[in-house]
């Protein structure tokens, strides 16, 4: 259960987020009219141009990275039709809500790479690299609701700097990059070995529910 402080902080973060959306939307309208805040739940679209249909995903940041996707292991595996030994790896590495797959080894109720069979680790890493463009499609371009965006906006909150990137250009960086696995996380690095994405078990908030064991992706400003 969330504390009152967490609830208050979450409410304030949403309020500030809406303010930032409006600031960026207003800025876009100084360049081209017709932009409105879209902000439908469970989509990547934050701003859309009603005249052209062009849509944007907004990332308001204070660091060089920010969360870009969060989903339960169950939903992820269903979406990508993952089963068998590969599904076993996801259940071990990210954990199963309400179960302790570590049998008491971990306070997070999950296993890390060094505690999982090398064959399973290899199969999972192969899957991530064989599906790197499809993963990008989900975590950046369209989510799981098939509402694609055309551009990603990187809004630096401390400086107010706003940069706009074509999602197709970002996908080109993915095409030439690769996923690598560490003991507790996976990283995606581009052709220059710069980190572009980070994947971890969320591991925060109320313990051992589906949110706690979710796949949480961060995107890094390497472009």
Q: Each PLM stretch: what is its role?
A:
Residues 1-45, 49-51, 58-223:
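Nucleic-acid endonuclease domains
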């Amino acid at each position: 259960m969330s504390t009152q402080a967490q609830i208050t902080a979450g409410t304030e973060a949403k309020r500030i987020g809406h303010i930032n959306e409006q600031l960026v939307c207003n800025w876009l309208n100084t360049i081209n009219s017709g932009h409105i805040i879209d902000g439908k739940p469970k989509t990547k679209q934050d701003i859309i141009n009603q005249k052209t249909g062009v849509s944007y995903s907004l990332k308001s940041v204070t660091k060089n990275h920010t969360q870009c996707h969060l989903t339960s292991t169950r939903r992820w595996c269903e979406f990508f039709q993952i089963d068998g030994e590969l599904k076993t790896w996801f259940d071990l590495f990210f954990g199963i809500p309400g179960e302790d797959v570590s049998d008491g080894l971990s306070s997070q109720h999950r296993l890390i790479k060094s505690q999982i069979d090398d064959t399973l680790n290899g199969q999972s890493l192969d899957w991530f690299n064989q599906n790197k463009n499809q993963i990008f499609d989900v975590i950046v371009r369209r989510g799981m609701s098939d509402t694609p965006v055309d551009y990603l906006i990187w809004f630096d909150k401390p400086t107010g700097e706003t940069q706009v990137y074509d999602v197709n250009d970002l996908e080109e960086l993915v095409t030439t990059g690769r996923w690598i696995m560490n003991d507790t996380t996976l990283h995606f690095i581009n052709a220059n070995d710069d980190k572009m994405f980070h994947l971890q078990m969320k591991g925060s908030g109320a313990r051992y529910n589906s949110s706690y064991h979710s796949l949480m992706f961060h995107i890094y400003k390497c472009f």
